[in-house]
UniProtKB/Swiss-Prot annotation:
Keywords: Leucine-rich repeat, Repeat. LRR repeats lie at residues 51-76, 77-99, 100-125, 130-155, 228-253, 262-286, 295-320, 321-346, 347-372, 373-397, 398-422, 424-447, 448-477, 478-503, 504-536, 537-563. Residues 9-47 form the F-box domain. Coiled coil: none annotated. Pfam families: F-box (PF00646), LRR_6 (PF13516). PANTHER family: F-BOX PROTEIN AT-B (PTHR13318:SF176), PARTNER OF PAIRED, ISOFORM B-RELATED (PTHR13318). The keyword Repeat applies. This is F-box protein At-B.
């Protein structure tokens, strides 16, 4: 060590490591700690702390030496306004504040005052303020950030007031190239489009007649993403008429009731998308939880018109089109010759026939996601198995998928993500995957009721590569999974960082002990678990707490423990575990890994 100069150590070795490994290195010796603090941290220009939720003290320790940052990403789940304010400054060009469950919109005024040079801003906030207060703070922020090129504002909650962005159109900087807003009323979105108007007339009245606004040729928005109460023809026509230069359009709506026939999306709106001749990415999704509301006025003819109007699409995402059949979806696959990403949700008429000639039309496919498409069977997957560039294959809730297609999947040498949730696969199918060289890093077998402990052994205890590459594994809701499967995982998976075994009723304390022992004995290239979900594992006892305490699970960032015996002693468990690990997030609320779907409902007492 003495022979290696400090500069060589910093420049040639330490600066090549990510933050996680830098922290590990700094714990080895005072020499290495000094090299990290003085030689590496001051030179960092970008820092991403989204993988765990630091408290105030941890954040201060991490950022103390980072004096050259221009890009910062924070998981703000447990941070207050004062902590966030302390990291802001004119040096920042890019700022991402995620999961701000404790922050009111006052933080917007801090950003506008302290970060005048921002180019990129992302904010995920809970609904904590009245619309008037939020609008006032938002206006102040936008006026203080005149150079923004990308802006993402997501407000989440049960009853979010969709008028929160009512005045945003008056303050948006003309430098903006990418915009995402959630939530937004359709009527407000149309007024916003009028603000972006470049030439010609715009449509703001039901009869589509209105006066001209003064043109604003300086707006060059290329990416637009909106979560709305309604997607309609009026909205699409307003968007395409005002932003013909759009490259990416992402629209999702969540209507409370069935739209009126004259105020819904029809062929007219889909055909109008052709005015955006540079459009390469399109997402149209209708999401209605517990309600049967969909795009009922769109059938194959509407998709025919879309495929003819937008032949340059490289990414297509459609959800809530139950009347579109194979002919409609196949027209997209055949017309869009450069299609790389194809996602369809809830298409009840989509079957294997749509993919009959997929290699002859869309051989460039890299991602295919077919979620809740009940007519899709293994035959479609066999056809997709001929797409040699496929990297992501999502067949979640396609219940007719069986073992017969897994040999085809095993031939996909670039596949890194595979979702078989709810499929009718068995232990024999796991043997096919386990013997293959497919480099899968993310695998979901959730709800695969015919896969047992033996199947997990076939998957991971063979000569294939998956045991070496797998980093995320979901075995939730699988009645055939017990401690034996977990023991196999700890023995074979050296790269695993995320594991979900929620609602696995036969998993006991022995599994927690096995995972803890594996963590403590990890050597060489073995990684540590970062996220573990044992929600509703009813066979776990409070005796497993001893294995969740130090020194076990040293790298754990998130632990889901809802509906277990731990939940009955929430305060004691939180004090015992989080007292030793202030950066660890405990979730008793049934969230998926990392609370990606429910952070806005958490309170400080839960962390």
């Amino acid at each position: 060590m003495e022979e290696v100069t400090r500069s060589v150590l910093a420049e040639e070795i330490l600066k090549r490591l990510d933050l996680e490994n830098l922290c590990s290195v700094a714990c080895v010796s005072t020499t290495l700690r000094s090299a990290v603090v003085s030689g590496v941290l001051p030179s960092l220009t970008s820092l991403d702390l989204s993988v765990f939720s630091p408290d105030d003290e941890t954040l201060n320790h991490v950022l103390r030496g980072c004096i050259g940052l221009s890009s910062l990403t924070l998981n703000c789940l447990r941070l207050n306004a004062a902590s966030v304010r302390g990291v802001l400054g004119p040096h920042l060009r890019e700022l991402h504040l995620l999961r701000c469950s404790l922050l009111s919109s006052t933080v917007l005024t801090y950003i506008g005052t302290l970060c005048p040079n921002l180019r990129v801003l992302t904010l995920e906030m809970a609904d904590l303020d009245s619309p008037d207060v939020f609008q006032s703070n938002l206006t102040q922020m936008l006026n203080g950030c005149p150079y923004l090129e990308s802006l993402q504002l997501n407000i989440r909650g049960i009853l979010v007031d969709a008028t929160a962005f009512q005045s945003v159109r008056f303050s948006l900087p003309e430098t903006l190239k990418a915009l995402r807003l959630q939530p937004l009323l359709e009527s407000e979105a149309i007024l916003l489009m009028n603000r972006f108007k470049v030439t010609g007339t715009y449509l703001s009245q039901p009869d589509y007649n209105s006066a001209l606004l003064s043109p604003s040729p300086s707006f060059t928005l290329q990416s637009l993403s909106l979560v709305l109460d309604l997607i309609s023809d009026r909205l699409i026509i307003a968007i395409t008429g005002s932003l013909p230069q759009l490259v990416k359009l992402d629209l999702e709506d969540r209507p409370e009731k069935e739209p009126f026939p004259d105020n819904d999306l029809t062929y007219t709106g889909l055909q109008a998308l052709g005015f955006c001749q540079q459009l390469t990415s399109l997402s149209l999704v209708r999401t209605c939880y517990n309600r049967k509301i969909s795009f009922k006025r769109i059938n194959d003819m509407g998709i025919f018109l879309l495929s003819e109007a937008c032949k340059g699409l490289e990414s297509v995402r459609l959800g809530g089109f139950p009347k579109v059949s194979d002919a409609g979806f196949a027209s997209l696959l055949h017309s869009c010759r450069n299609l790389k990403k194809f996602e369809v949700r809830g298409a009840f008429l989509l079957s294997d026939l749509a993919f009959h000639d997929v290699t002859g039309s869309s051989c460039s496919l890299q991602e295919v996601r077919l979620s809740t498409c009940p007519l899709i069977t293994s035959e479609a997957v066999k056809k997709l198995g001929l797409c040699g560039n496929l990297e992501v294959l999502d067949l979640g809730s396609c219940k007719s998928i069986s073992d017969s297609c897994l040999n085809s999947v095993s031939a996909l040498r670039k596949l890194t993500s595979l979702n078989l949730a709810g499929a009718d696969v068995t232990d024999s199918g796991m043997l096919a995957l386990g013997k293959s060289d497919v480099p899968i890093t993310q695998l979901s077998l959730r709800g695969c009721r015919r896969v047992s402990d033996r199947g997990i052994s076939y998957l991971l205890n063979n000569e294939g590569t998956i045991s070496k590459t797998l980093s995320t594994l979901d075995l939730g809701h699988m009645p055939g999974i017990s401690d034996r499967a977990i023991h196999t995982i700890t023995h074979c998976c050296k790269a695993l960082t995320e594991l979900s075994i929620r609602s696995c009723f036969h998993v006991t304390d022995s599994s927690i002990e096995s995972l803890a022992t594996w963590e403590r004995q990890a050597e060489g290239g073995s990684k540590q678990l970062r996220k573990l979900n044992v929600h509703n594992c009813v066979s776990l006892t409070t005796g497993a707490l001893r294995w969740l305490s130090k020194p076990s699970f040293a790298g754990l960032h998130w632990l889901g423990m809802g509906q277990t015996r731990f939940a009955g002693r929430k305060e004691t468990v939180t004090a015992m575990i989080c007292g030793q690990r202030p950066w660890l997030t405990l979730c008793f609320d049934g969230c998926e890994l990392g609370c990606s779907d429910g952070w806005e409902f958490h309170t400080p007492q839960r962390h």
